[in-house]
Amino acid sequence: MLLQIAEPGQSAVPHQHKLAVGIDLGTTNSLVASVRSGEAKTLPDMKGNVILPSVVQYQEDKICVGMNAYQSAAMDPQNTIISVKRLMGRSLKDIQARYPELPYQFSESENGLPVIQTAQGEVNPIQVSSEILKSLSRRAQDTLGGELEGVVITVPAYFDDAQRAGTKDAATLAGLNVLRLLNEPTAAAIAYGLDSGQEGVIAVYDLGGGTFDISILRLSKGVFEVLATGGDSALGGDDFDHVLAQWIKEQAGITSSLSSQEQRELLTLATQTKVALSDSDNVKISFKDWSGEISVELFNSLIQPLIKKTLMACRRALKDADITSEEVMEVVMVGGSTRTPFVRTSVGDYFGQTPLTSIDPDQVVAIGAAIQADILVGNKPDSEMLLLDVIPLSLGIETMGGLVEKIIPRNTTIPVAKAQEFTTFKDGQTGMMVHVVQGEREMVEDGRSLARFSLKGIPPMAAGAAHIRVTYQVDADGLLSVTAMEKSTGVQSHIQVKPSYGLSDNEVANMLKDSMTYAKEDMQARALAEQQVEADRVIEGLVVALNNDGDALLSKEEQAEILQAIEALITLRQGTDAQAIEDGIKKADEASQEFAARRMDASIRAALAGQSIDEV
């Protein structure tokens, strides 16, 4: 009997074409695309526009999405939500610290997540995102003439679990069946690399409105692998606007706070000026009572520090992939912000080649997502494409002494499942706390805590006798599940990791930098902690053994010798010399070897008491 195995959501009927789309849910703009007659194309609205501004306006009697909402932003800033993607998965405190100029009235929900006060009441970022997805879904179904079987939605490679889960929740709220979340740079590489059949190393430079991602990829014989990723989940073209807006404000001599409407007008002016500078050397500006002019050279100097940050992330990603810039065959430019000429020339200078821009950088991600959706829904059963994403930071578990045991190293391809066995530290231990951590450092205190859960019901045994299997599983969407199981009984506990808010600005980059900066100190701290844990085990074991069998098996002098070694080890354990502790452990072992042998003999005699030779 044969069992047909297919990707979830794939068609079991080989020649039945199903309707599936790829959605680029962007910070500034969103798009939807589909494969039609063998070609992936973005789908336009009734007016022929393929780009939908990621803007939602809440009026008392209706909700507007897209261009109409965008045009209302200056007049109704508090009810018009722009760049909601930047708020996804973040706490209210984080948002207020990061974006103090936002004109919205925020409050905190019961679970600590932000909500925005609008004319229709409170809304959260997930609900706002779902309105954008609903609009794209309606457009797709009107254009394609039928119900959608599924969608592939793209997210920045640096979105963490909370941000990815929030995106999925928004899609569910919009009534969509999510086939997969796909990293934006990966989608772009599908659109470029696989269509042209090229092989080699490719750098995907993705600078959108609110996020930056760099991915180093390898295409080889149909296998598409992400070698390394990097970036910043809070850096994009919006920051160009904010820098320019601040310059205009300073030039205009404005020192007082602006109203919500004035803030929106200023940002709109900055955006229009930025776009105009892509085609002109000088642009005239007027704001309130001030008029002036800005040159492209001055604008370039304002945004240069931001571009430099992206190039530093490129350098780190290349180092992670063990690739030099000379080995990069092509550089793919993605995201509307790469239209800025200074961005293109800066990236070209860094990699020593002219970047690829033949596919519209605004549309390339949606096109790649559409190709992937067409495969996952079952329209291309013979496709040989293999997609391998990676996790950006190592995932590990806390062990005795505050140490991190890495279970899935960073840049491991996903989906992935890895397991490791652990044991109990104390006699009779019936429970275990599992602490899931993220990061590259050796000590828990230097990493990022993701979750904690407990495993109960471990049978009472001697220390080290129980076998607990801990499994980490990261699915194709980058969501982490952790399971702990005691092997003899099968008792288990499970958790899906969903942090309450996302990584702070540059936190991923800083965590990687710190792991290199403090590598020597971390290894020394780990060596010390390991010896301290081993010393604790030896001390506890000897104390229990002496209490149980010392009087029966040892003379007073022998007991005194072992006690002296224990006391010496206790003193050494309180110090910071790992080698001295290791030497103390060896001396304690030597002092107790004869005692251990006598205990073993006594155990064997007790086990054989009353049995005949034949029975043995």
From Swiss-Prot:
Pfam families: HSP70
Keyword Nuclease listed: no
GO molecular function: ATP binding; ATP hydrolysis activity; ATP-dependent protein folding chaperone; unfolded protein binding
PROSITE patterns xrefs: HSP70_1, HSP70_2
Record protein name field: Chaperone protein HscA homolog
Task of the protein: Chaperone involved in the maturation of iron-sulfur cluster-containing proteins. Has a low intrinsic ATPase activity which is markedly stimulated by HscB.
Entry keyword set: ATP-binding, Chaperone, Nucleotide-binding
InterPro entries the UniProt entry points to: ATPase_NBD (IPR043129), Heat_shock_70_CS (IPR018181), HscA_NBD (IPR042039), HSP70_C_sf (IPR029048), HSP70_peptide-bd_sf (IPR029047), Hsp_70_fam (IPR013126), ISC_FeS_clus_asmbl_HscA (IPR010236)
A single GO BP: iron-sulfur cluster assembly
The family this protein is said to belong to: Belongs to the heat shock protein 70 family.
UniProt organism field: Aliivibrio fischeri (strain MJ11) (Vibrio fischeri)
